[in-house]
Regions:
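A non-catalytic alpha/beta surface segment that caps or lines the substrate-entry region
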Residues: 7-112, 131-170, 176-179
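Active-site-adjacent substrate-binding region
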Residues: 38, 271-380
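N-terminal capping segment at the start of a domain
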Residues: 1-18, 30, 196-200, 270-273, ...
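Acidic/histidine-rich catalytic neighborhood of metal-dependent amide-processing enzymes
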Residues: 84-106, 113-114, 126-131, 170-183, ...
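Short, conserved micro-motifs enriched in small and acidic residues
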Residues: 14-18, 202-213, 358-362
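Hydrophobic anchor at the start of a short beta-strand
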Residues: 33-34, 232, 263, 309, ...
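Short beta-strand element of the alpha/beta-hydrolase
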Residues: 117-122
Length: 380
């Protein structure tokens, strides 16, 4: 993990490519063959969201100056484009933006002709920081009693689309106050996105070096004791931090050959906080509940292993598991949290290997292996 965190690896970058090559080499040391699948990706989220927020603010200003139809149409189009940019949407706004290359690492173990497949997912890129991720913010929310009252994380990114929405509503209804609020929120959101874009990349030990080393541990165990009737794909995607572009590309390439009835996706995301958990649901704008059968499997295995799971948490963001769940696959996400129901050191400079709870990482590996072994014995 310390080797990986020393690689500066923003989404769709040369550093991400080096991280992918490093991971392929580590798989090879274990005796597992892995390959890199290069895919087109934009590599940010702050540009499409920032542009959308700016267009929404411009639409609001046009409306306030008497051009309500044009302003409302511009703000509405910006809102629709921004909404599509959140996973698992079609990412319409970024299609007009420059594209780079992202690098997915794929390692296949077990019988190649197996009828059933488990895909274990990590990601090897790392995030930009930003003031919106300041660790003091959850502490303030906790002092205000906001953390205890809810089991769903705050929608950090959803308000960004709120500016264009309010500007459009104000334009079409003639309510100038709504329009003014939309303009202010749009300008503020654009500024926040610009600030994130100017920040450097965090070390990314918990998010998501913990999952990468978990894949390596799983590879070692599966080589030592191969599954009998199950193909296992150990997948580390790039560009997760630019709204799961690597996972979306994997889906476009591989979902047509992975049948929904015989494929299980197991996403590992930031498993180095004090408390292990299995997400109940997630989504930036729309909360999507994870499949009941997948959750029952994970909860039952955790009980058998005597692994305590932090109960009933949902997140108003998106892991790579959101893509496979939205595509109709049985999916589960193993993650972790602090007492404040947040990933430890999330998108901050303290996200170092020295601050990772390796006991939680080990429990996540145990639960992941148990899931694979159980599905090898019998399917859902």
């Amino acid at each position: 993990m310390e080797e990986l965190e020393r690689i500066e690896r923003p989404s769709a970058s040369e550093g991400e490519r080096r991280a992918a090559e490093w991971l392929v080499g580590r798989f090879a040391e274990l005796g597992a063959e892995a390959r890199i699948e290069a895919e087109p990706a934009h590599g940010t989220y702050w540009w499409p969201l920032g542009i959308g927020a700016t267009l929404g603010a411009i639409g609001g200003i046009l409306s306030l100056r008497g051009r309500r139809v044009l302003g409302g149409a511009l703000a509405g189009a910006a809102a629709a484009g921004m909404a599509s940019d959140y996973p698992p949407g079609k990412r319409l706004l970024r299609r007009a933006l420059p594209r780079r290359t992202t690098y997915n690492v794929v390692c296949e173990l077990g019988p190649a002709t197996a009828e059933r497949t488990v895909v274990a997912i990590a990601h090897h890129d790392a995030a930009h920081s930003g003031l919106v991720f300041h660790p003091k913010l959850p502490e303030i929310a906790d002092r205000l009693g906001m953390i205890e009252r809810t089991d769903t994380s705050p929608p950090l990114m959803a308000p960004v689309v709120g500016g264009p929405v309010l500007a459009a509503l104000g334009a079409f209804t003639g309510r100038r106050l709504l329009t003014k609020l939309g303009v202010v929120l749009g300008i503020g959101s654009a500024a926040a996105m610009a600030e994130i874009g100017m920040r450097e990349v965090v070390p990314g030990a918990n998010d998501n070096g913990t999952a990468v080393v978990s894949l390596l541990a799983l590879a070692e165990q599966l080589i030592e004791q191969p599954p009998e009737s199950l193909r296992v794909i150990l997948l580390s995607v790039g560009s997760e931090e630019s709204f799961s572009e690597g996972m979306k590309a994997f889906g476009e390439r591989h979902f047509p050959t992975l049948t929904r009835e015989s494929t299980f996706f197991l996403c590992l995301e930031s498993t180095g906080s004090p408390h292990l958990l299995v997400l109940r649901g997630e989504g930036f704008l729309k909360m999507r509940e994870y499949p009941a059968r997948a959750l029952a499997l994970m909860d039952g295995l955790a009980e058998e292993l005597d692994v305590w799971l932090y109960p009933n948490l949902r997140t108003r963001s998106g892991t790579d598991g959101l893509e496979s769940m939205a595509a109709g696959y049985e999916t589960a996400v193993i993650a972790s949290c602090t007492d404040l129901k947040q990933p430890a050191n999330y998108h901050w400079w303290h996200d170092l290997a020295e601050n990772v709870d390796f006991g939680t990482v080990a429990d996540g590996i145990r639960l992941s292996e148990a899931t694979i072994r159980r599905l090898d014995e019998r399917w859902l």
